UniProtKB/Swiss-Prot annotation:
Gene this protein is translated from: ruvC
Cofactor note: Binds 2 Mg(2+) ion per subunit.
Subunit structure: Homodimer which binds Holliday junction (HJ) DNA. The HJ becomes 2-fold symmetrical on binding to RuvC with unstacked arms; it has a different conformation from HJ DNA in complex with RuvA. In the full resolvosome a probable DNA-RuvA(4)-RuvB(12)-RuvC(2) complex forms which resolves the HJ.
Coiled coil regions in record: none
Similarity field: Belongs to the RuvC family.
Designated name of the protein: Crossover junction endodeoxyribonuclease RuvC
One biological process term in Gene Ontology: DNA recombination
Swiss-Prot/TrEMBL catalytic activity: Endonucleolytic cleavage at a junction such as a reciprocal single-stranded crossover between two homologous DNA duplexes (Holliday junction)
Organism (species): Brevibacillus brevis (strain 47 / JCM 6285 / NBRC 100599)
Residue sites binding Mg(2+) 2 per the record: E67
Amino acid sequence: MRILGIDPGIAIVGFGVVDKEGSQLRPVQYGSIQTEAGLPVPLRLKQIFEAMQSLLETYRPDEMSVEKLFFNKNVTTAFTVGQARGVIILAAELAGVPVYEYTPMQVKQAVTGYGGAEKKQIQEMTKLLLRLKEVPKPDDVADALGIAITHAQFRAFISISEGVKK
């Protein structure tokens, strides 16, 4: 199964493509989509949408996992990131790729085994689990890989619950 993990943002969208074969995880590609700060938000959203369409076409993931929004301070930032998240999810929907969402706590739990893990711990475990030489930069990229790992870990439970619903 191929998973596209996404850490949404307006300035930087981290992405990580991971293949899961049995219990093995293999990184395929990872990086970021970056938009220029001075550009109007609609143009930045268009750039993110088009880049997402390209990623989805190039890597053809079976499923996509996205981090749920969690902001407790800056409401303006939350709205803008929410807009970016919307075009990201729309691109996946148009490509016929199912989207799964995870909270930051779920990511911490899946990657490190501890829901209160620090960012550095998550990044180091991501590096270890994917057998990378170093932690990917910027942080958004490492976060996206962590989100893909989270979906790989939760996938077995999703399959069981989907079977129950049928």
